[in-house]
């Protein structure tokens, strides 16, 4: 089956959204949101995520400890937990709805109007998933920058810096945003083919019946069988 340009754009949007959703899940799990290198002990690196804090020592296994209380976390990490989990739910639900509402997948028992509404709702959820991914990652980055350049902290105290998970989170948000934009753009390419409604009654078979002309000659004419006398 040859796919239309509209279907290819929808497929590209779905793949980008799926990639962004996977990257967002990995970002949530990784502890490398912030890193801290100790000048007194260069062989030891501290890493902090939204779920745990770890100490990475060379030639020694990494030791991690989960945060004991949600309320004891900084405000940016509390918000990051909530929004990242919400992003996973919105992204997954948006992917499913966009798949059901796209031309890439055909379901005979789904009505066209209902399918179009599913696609519209899915595109909205994908855009929301992008926002709920970029916001917590950017907030944690902003808080890290503020603490790094805080003049009230003595220079001898080590400062937290960006971890690799922040860059992955930004990439996830961009992929989700691009996927959502492609899905929205596909809706503006043109109208979908609306299926014609089925006839209310059964189809009447045709038959030939003679018709008399004014000059006395006859010719055959197609008529419904139930109208032939």
Swiss-Prot record:
Record-annotated disulphide pairs: none
Topology, Extracellular side: 32-81, 146-164
This protein's record includes keyword GTP-binding: no
Molecular function terms from GO: structural molecule activity
Compartment annotation: Cell junction, Tight junction; Cell membrane
Any one cellular-component term (Gene Ontology): tight junction
Cytoplasmic side: 1-10, 103-124, 186-229
Protein name listed in UniProt: Claudin-25
Origin species: Homo sapiens
Organism classification: Eukaryota, Metazoa, Chordata, Craniata, Vertebrata
Top-rank taxon, per record: Eukaryota
PANTHER family per UniProt: CLAUDIN (PTHR12002)
InterPro entries: Claudin, PMP22/EMP/MP20/Claudin
Recorded topology in the membrane: Multi-pass membrane protein
Record has Transmembrane as a keyword: yes
Major localization listed first in the record, in broad terms: other
One GO BP: cell adhesion
